[in-house]
Amino acid sequence: MSALTTAFGCKSGPDILTSSSSVRDPKPTKAGPKSERMYGLEGATFAAYVPFYAPCFTTYIGDEDVSEKPIRLFHGAADDYVPVAPCRAYVERLSKVGKDVTLVEYPDAHHAFDNPLLKVGPAPQSQTTRRCMMTEEPVGTIINAVTKQPFTMEDPCVERGPNLGYNAAATASATQAVKEFLQVTLKLK
């Protein structure tokens, strides 16, 4: 989770939770969405989803059946750790089925652009699945879409050395965008 989303945290109470988790949480069930069950928030609902650097290169079964709550994705256009292109396609698919979803891209911003402790540059030992395309099988197994075998971090598509780094302009813009979005969504204005 990014430093920016951590700063907003969660507010409890009916219908005012926000989440930076995947936008692909399943529809609410009697016990609540999976993330709500995992974190002990049963009975509460999320008001919005605000993922940063979302990994959109896995196609899940039913991944267009997401919450009716607004989804705002924030991504660096220069992110080569978790590239933005698959998110563009996913947002387009979600929009076509009537979801309230927006992708905001920041030019020249890399992965972790909101972390002021990171200088822009490669992370030589970090693994990235940026060249991998994965799909979910009916039994829940994630497979490599090219090899049709269960995905592992040993697959040839896994690479090392993506770039990371702080971008002050992107951070300031994203911070303002998230604040404004949450003020409207949570009816704080």
Predicted regions and their residues:
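Residues at the starts of beta-strands that form the adenosine-phosphate
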Residues: 18, 70, 100-102
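Short beta-strand/loop motif that positions the catalytic acidic residue
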Residues: 72-75, 79, 106
